[in-house]
UniProtKB/Swiss-Prot annotation:
Crosslinked positions (Cyclopeptide (Gly-Asn)): 1-31
Protein name as it appears in the record: Chassatide C6
Source organism (scientific name): Chassalia chartacea
Keyword field contains Disulfide bond: yes
Post-translational note: This is a cyclic peptide.
Function: Probably participates in a plant defense mechanism.
Length: 31
């Protein structure tokens, strides 16, 4: 949860979750 994936998750889930990103504070992060 430290590397921003350049995607927000305010209205929809992280599409980048397929590469390991998850929602945190309305922004998608990985690791």
């Amino acid at each position: 949860g430290v590397i921003p994936c350049g995607e927000s998750c305010v209205f929809i889930p992280c599409i980048s979750s397929v590469i390991g990103c998850s929602c945190k504070n309305k922004v998608c992060y990985r690791n």
